[in-house]
């Protein structure tokens, strides 16, 4: 499942491929990875996990903003000075701020991985 999610944001996968393949030592082995499992499987697991996190942040952030909008709508029609008026305003602010921050974190993560992927050079292949 994580390997399929890794394909949803290919630049995240490319970033980790460049990082892992670029960190090979002189013997051609990448430290910290089980050679029997293979580097590619680990790269797809990591990239899939990051992609899942970004997707969850986007979904939860969007739903939180939507819920904040519902409370704003209820706030507009609540009687001024009533407890419902103050409560819906506080709920609107809380949900909308949290949702906006989650969306902001997800977008910043996507931009950061895109910029890092573009800035890293492709690893050189060892033909020895």
Curated annotation (Swiss-Prot):
The keyword Transmembrane applies. It is found in: Cell membrane. It is a multi-pass membrane protein. It comes from the Bacteria. GO terms for cellular component: plasma membrane. Keywords: Cell membrane, Membrane, Transmembrane, Transmembrane helix. The chain crosses the membrane at residues 52-72, 91-111. This is Uncharacterized protein MPN_575.
């Amino acid at each position: 499942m994580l390997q399929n999610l890794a394909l949803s944001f290919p630049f995240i996968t490319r970033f980790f491929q460049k990082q892992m393949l670029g960190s090979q030592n002189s013997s051609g082995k990448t430290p910290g990875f089980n050679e029997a499992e293979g580097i590619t499987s680990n790269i797809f697991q990591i990239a899939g996990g990051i992609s899942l996190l970004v997707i969850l942040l986007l979904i939860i952030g969007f739903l939180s903003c939507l819920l904040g909008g519902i409370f704003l709508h209820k706030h507009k029609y609540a009687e001024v000075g009533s407890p419902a008026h103050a409560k819906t305003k506080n709920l609107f602010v809380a949900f909308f701020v949290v949702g906006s921050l989650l969306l902001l974190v997800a977008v910043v993560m996507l931009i950061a991985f895109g910029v890092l992927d573009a800035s890293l050079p492709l690893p050189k292949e060892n033909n020895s």
